[in-house]
Amino acid sequence: MDNLQQVVSALQSGEVIAYPTEGVFGVGCDPDNPQAVEKLLALKQRPIEKGLILIAANYQQLQPYIDDAQLSDLQKQKIFSTWPGPVTWVMPVKKDISPLLTGKFTSIAVRVSDHPLVQKLCHQFGKPITSTSANLTGLPPCKTVTEVQNQLGEHLSAILEGETGGRENPTEIRDAFSDTVLRQG
């Protein structure tokens, strides 16, 4: 029996949680709750300028954040051909989206994950969650629940129990306009 409902409740309460992704554990929160995002950035000691990735169960969950009218049909086809899967796309962002999510950029990084637990979590929560690697600055990203508990346990309200997808590398990041690979996967 998984602890999915406990994790969803923590998200709904504005807490920071950890969960397995394609390659490593991620830490995340409700992207629409500024206090939760600030908590996450403080936990990670992550500069606001960097922005965060949104991870979702499907494209519809990402649409409130993306200005996809700026993308051509061909660009959308290319994006959809990689999802669900381990490719994060940097896409045009809607004007009212918080700089806590976008950082210094006029775009937002988004992914439709094929990890079954991420799928379940985002479906149950009803929207995307933020995603950044579960580790303290200077330490390697966590790949097991035990590693997450040892590094971050006291700072997290819940950890979604399960295993990562087994990828050795982080997910690839690509630019939706140019199709340039920004981070090799």
From Swiss-Prot:
**What start-end ranges are recorded for coiled-coil regions in this protein?**
none
Entry GO terms, CC: cytoplasm
Q: Which GO terms describe its molecular function?
A: ATP binding; double-stranded RNA binding; L-threonylcarbamoyladenylate synthase; tRNA binding
SUPFAM superfamilies for this protein: YrdC/RibB
Q: Which top-level group of life is the source organism from? A: Bacteria
Name the cystine pairs. none
Instruction: Provide the reaction this enzyme catalyses.
Output: L-threonine + hydrogencarbonate + ATP = L-threonylcarbamoyladenylate + diphosphate + H2O
Protein keywords = ATP-binding, Cytoplasm, Nucleotide-binding, Nucleotidyltransferase, Transferase, tRNA processing
Which InterPro entries did the record assign?
A: DHBP_synth_RibB-like_a/b_dom, Sua5-like_dom, TC-AMP_synthase, TC-AMP_synthase_SUA5
Domain (YrdC-like): residue spans on this chain: 1-185
Is Cell division one of the keywords UniProt gives this record? Answer: no
EC code: 2.7.7.87
**Can you tell me which family this protein belongs to?**
Belongs to the SUA5 family. TsaC subfamily.
Its biological function? Required for the formation of a threonylcarbamoyl group on adenosine at position 37 (t(6)A37) in tRNAs that read codons beginning with adenine. Catalyzes the conversion of L-threonine, HCO(3)(-)/CO(2) and ATP to give threonylcarbamoyl-AMP (TC-AMP) as the acyladenylate intermediate, with the release of diphosphate.
Q: What is this protein called?
A: Threonylcarbamoyl-AMP synthase
Query: Which species expresses this protein natively?
Result: Photobacterium profundum (strain SS9)
**What is the taxonomic lineage of the source species?**
Bacteria, Pseudomonadati, Pseudomonadota, Gammaproteobacteria, Vibrionales
Q: Which gene encodes it?
A: tsaC
